């Protein structure tokens, strides 16, 4: 009888430990990296192959990672879909994406990693002392897909919030990152805020991705000239003033990754700073010690395809390339030249250093990078590596504290 009581107490204590949120380390300056498990093809790996793969990447100067894609998906019934509960999967959402193509949620489901692989990923970063966030995505901008169906139902949203938070805690995540910057309707945006607010109430750290506090025609014309309409929903429905004013989230990750100067035909840090200043002017208190929300500045580790390289809707080159591809094609010029091959604009390592220093000076709480798969590789010389440049600047900030 005594042994049975001991076992019951252990089970109760274990369940309490599992249900408790993991406490994130307080940081003077955050450096977060988005890690897409599916883009790293981890769904094809065995658990024993995880560490050798991640060891190929440069994790210097990183305090947090957000695991995006490949861990879980949202079921339209409010369930958590994983590779290990395949027998419980609900039907996929049937709809059209923003390009007019059929939503292919099934393809994404087939790229979910095994539980053993996910556990190895978590163990890898924990051993490095890196905090882990779990990213919630809709898998379809401007329709929401299955997530959109959940967000349109309040009771389902609350149920899903509890499931999502419990799931994240089981893997030792400190927070949830919400990467659905374009809710297509006011109702879905409301549900999205409810999901974030409930997640924070349940004790998790919460971050949300953003581009602009407001969206106007000038922004659309200058940000993504060919796909301006894709960005028109965010400022219309997200209600950033409510999110900031009520402290619904802990971090806002501002995804102004690139800043193209059409006159210079290259990336321009001054254009980047103009974009950053829109947030600084809209919410000046959030860039002081009195902030309710931490503002993180995004840096894109990929190329911008020059408009001049396009003929109508046809692209003469290969389109936007990641840095592995650029380095293979152009060598060190891909890292030192602002304009590569007459068709790709990129940040140089000097640009990255300048952005990190300026973000800190202007009161941004940190920086984040999109995306691990591109410029984190250790295959290239570190002096040409953007992540190494960022790491050195971030580590200098940490040392000064």
Report residues per predicted region.
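Bacterial Sec-dependent N-terminal signal peptides
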Residues: 1-24
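Histidine-acidic metal/acid-base catalytic patches
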Residues: 357
């Amino acid at each position: 009888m005594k042994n049975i009581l001991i076992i019951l107490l252990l089970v109760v204590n274990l369940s309490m430990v599992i249900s408790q949120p993991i406490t994130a380390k307080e940081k003077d300056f955050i450096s977060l990296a988005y890690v897409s498990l599916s883009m790293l093809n981890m769904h094809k790996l065995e658990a024993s192959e995880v560490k050798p793969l991640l060891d190929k990447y440069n994790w210097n100067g990183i305090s947090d990672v957000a695991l995006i894609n490949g861990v879980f998906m949202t079921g339209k019934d409010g369930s958590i879909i994983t590779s290990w509960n395949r027998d419980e999967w609900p039907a996929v959402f049937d709809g059209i994406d923003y390009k007019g193509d059929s939503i292919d949620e099934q393809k994404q489901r087939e790229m979910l990693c095994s539980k053993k692989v996910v556990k190895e990923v978590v163990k890898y970063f924990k051993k490095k002392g890196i905090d882990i966030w779990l990213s919630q995505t809709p898998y379809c901008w401007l329709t929401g897909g299955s997530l959109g169906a959940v967000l349109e139902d309040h009771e389902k949203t609350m149920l899903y919030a509890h499931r999502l938070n419990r799931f994240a805690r089981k893997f030792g995540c400190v927070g949830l990152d919400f990467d659905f910057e374009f809710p297509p309707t006011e109702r879905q945006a409301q549900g999205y805020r409810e999901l974030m607010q409930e997640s924070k109430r349940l004790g998790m750290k919460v971050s949300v991705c953003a581009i602009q506090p407001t969206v106007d025609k000038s922004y659309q014309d200058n940000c993504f000239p060919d796909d301006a309409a894709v960005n028109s929903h965010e400022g219309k429905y997200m209600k950033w003033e409510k999110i900031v004013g009520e402290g619904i989230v802990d971090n806002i990750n501002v995804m102004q990754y690139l800043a193209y100067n059409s006159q210079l035909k290259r990336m321009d840090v001054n254009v980047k700073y103009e974009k950053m200043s829109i947030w600084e002017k809209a919410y000046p208190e959030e860039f002081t010690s009195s902030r309710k929300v931490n503002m993180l500045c995004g840096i894109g580790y990929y190329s911008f395809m020059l408009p001049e390289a396009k003929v109508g809707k046809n692209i003469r080159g290969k389109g936007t390339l990641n840095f592995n591809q650029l380095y293979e094609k152009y060598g060190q010029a891909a890292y030192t030249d602002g304009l590569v091959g007459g068709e790709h604009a990129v940040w140089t390592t000097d640009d990255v250093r300048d952005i990190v220093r300026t973000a800190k000076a202007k009161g941004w709480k940190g920086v984040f990078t999109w995306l691990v798969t591109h410029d984190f590789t250790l295959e290239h010389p570190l002096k040409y590596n953007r992540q190494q440049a960022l790491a050195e600047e971030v580590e200098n900030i940490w040392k000064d504290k």
